[in-house]
Amino acid sequence: MSYYGNGGYNPYGAYGNVPPPVYGTPGLAPPTVHVHTDGGHHHGHHHHHHSFLHELGHALTGHHHHHHGHHFGHHHHHHHGHH
């Protein structure tokens, strides 16, 4: 019986364990959600995609952040102008 009850941790533990390894840092998890909510709909989709790569690259590698940062700024400006 104990095993069954303990099994409940399976889904919970897996869920909490998935974000850290994927993002690299637990602190990156909250920002992703915030961006999606703050982004909205049209802007949120594009921003979310860049944010994910930007955050992921920053966590995995620092130099990648610089490259994406420049690209992100350019895209953001273009998107803003179009809007």
UniProtKB/Swiss-Prot annotation:
Deletion phenotype: RNAi-mediated knockdown results in partial sensitivity to Cu(2+) ions with only 60% of animals reaching adulthood 4 days after egg laying.
Record keywords: Stress response
Induction details: By heavy metal stress conditions, in response to Cu(2+).
Stretch list, region Disordered: 62-83
Tissue expression notes: Weakly expressed in the intestine, but expression is up-regulated in response to Cu(2+).
Functional summary from the UniProt entry: Plays a role in the stress response to heavy metals such as copper, probably in a fos-1/kgb-1-dependent manner.
Entries under PANTHER family matching the protein: PROTEIN KREG-1, PROTEIN KREG-1-RELATED
Name of the molecule in the record: Protein kreg-1
Gene of this entry: kreg-1
